[in-house]
Amino acid sequence: MVNGPAELRRKLVIVGDGACGKTCLLIVFSKGTFPEVYVPTVFENYVADVEVDGRKVELALWDTAGQEDYDRLRPLSYPDSNVILICFSVDSPDSLDNVLEKWISEVLHFCQGVPIILVGCKSDLRDDPHTIEALRQQQQQPVSTSEGQQVAQRIGAADYLECSAKTGRGVREVFEAATRASLRVKEKKEKKKKCVVL
């Protein structure tokens, strides 16, 4: 990915509903393989080197549990974050609703001033006939790009991106956008606005 040692270090925390695609996104980006078996995460850390705009950055990737059982444990991952990815799954409109109903308030509580990237995961399922039919039976449909963009605007996200960890489409762009957002904030405010757990 990057030649030579990274000049800068940044911490990225990824949150969102359980099974929305967070861990697959991190593993595909950091290790280049797609995990075929779903194992709920408690806490996992990965490291990846990213080069954006000629700058080498070591990105510490903090994976978190989306399940409610971990609501009291998850805030331990927020301190010193430089950028937050809030994820939802394109095949789960409920997971997008939860961005507004749960995730944004948690992130803003613990990470005031930290840039947020909204990420629509599993974008390959938007056109998948089985997914479309399963959602139709529940009077739902896959989340559209414009719906994702509207939520990103409502929560004040620095960016909105979609990706498919399964096909690899858009994965690198998510982390490049996140890295850029973390660098912009640092340049604007060297006071280092970081997450605080109260």
From Swiss-Prot:
A motif (Effector region) lies at residues 38-46. The gene is RHO1. SMART domains: RAB (SM00175), RAN (SM00176), RAS (SM00173), RHO (SM00174). A lipid is attached at residue 195 (S-geranylgeranyl cysteine). It comes from Candida albicans (strain SC5314 / ATCC MYA-2876). One of its GO terms (biological process) is Rho protein signal transduction. This is GTP-binding protein RHO1. GO terms for molecular function: GTP binding; GTPase activity; protein kinase binding. Pfam families: Ras. Its main location: membrane. GTP binds at residues 16-23, 63-67, 121-124. Belongs to the small GTPase superfamily. Rho family. NCBIfam families: small_GTP. SUPFAM superfamilies: P-loop containing nucleoside triphosphate hydrolases (SSF52540). The modification Cysteine methyl ester is found at residue 195. GO terms for cellular component: cytosol; extracellular vesicle; hyphal tip; plasma membrane. It is a lipid-anchor. Residues 196-198 form a propeptide. CDD domains: RhoA_like (cd01870). It is found in: Cell membrane. Keywords: Cell membrane, GTP-binding, Lipoprotein, Membrane, Methylation, Nucleotide-binding, Prenylation. It comes from the Eukaryota.
